[in-house]
Amino acid sequence: MGGRAATALRSLLFWVDVAGPQGPFEPAFAAEHPIDPQVRVGHVHLRTADIDRVRAFYVDIMGFDVILEARDVPGWGTTGDILFLSAGGYHHHLGFNTWKSAGGPPQPDGVTGLHHVALNFSSRARLAQTVQRLVDAGVPLRQLSDHGTHLAVYLSDPDGNDLELAWDRPFEEWPVYGSAGAPAIDAPLDLDDLLAAA
């Protein structure tokens, strides 16, 4: 995918520039030896059963750019397919491989591992545009929530990896967790109201 669709996606997603403070929260427990406060999640790399299936979902429906796609690549003591995806030209925000998972089933409930990956959008309207494409493609939405700090739409990718598509409210609108006046952090989000912003 290229051209207008790729340009549109680059404007849809943003990856937080951590040059400044990220919000009003004080840590519940401050580490004795704190990590670099500028650290951020650079990318998430997931196992997939089928590169073509995951490519169709993340590129054709979600709108990510393909940075690298290769077959029969050596890795982790075996060979498999790889796919690196980006929004805006970064080396990759999402990576996928079949090194030890080709043809495998989704991870079952009741085991440890990744809970979900959150993708933050730059505006409510841009979140709504992507959710509209998912709805149009028949992708089931698992949960729609207003968490006070952000709006969230939860769904699963073709391998059963859970995704959260989110839009953060401005910091000054965030509730303070634990305060008497803080709203519920898992209030329902109306799909029609969200899609009206598209």
Stretch-by-stretch model annotation:
Residues 1-35, 40-49, 84, 105-198:
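Vicinal oxygen chelate
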Residues 30-33, 102-107:
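Short beta-strand/turn micro-motifs at beta-sheet edges
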Residues 35-39, 45-98:
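Core segments of cupin and vicinal oxygen chelate
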Residues 90-95, 104, 159-163:
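Short, charged/polar, Gly/Pro-enriched secondary-structure boundary elements
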Residues 97-101, 168:
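Acetyl-CoA-dependent GNAT
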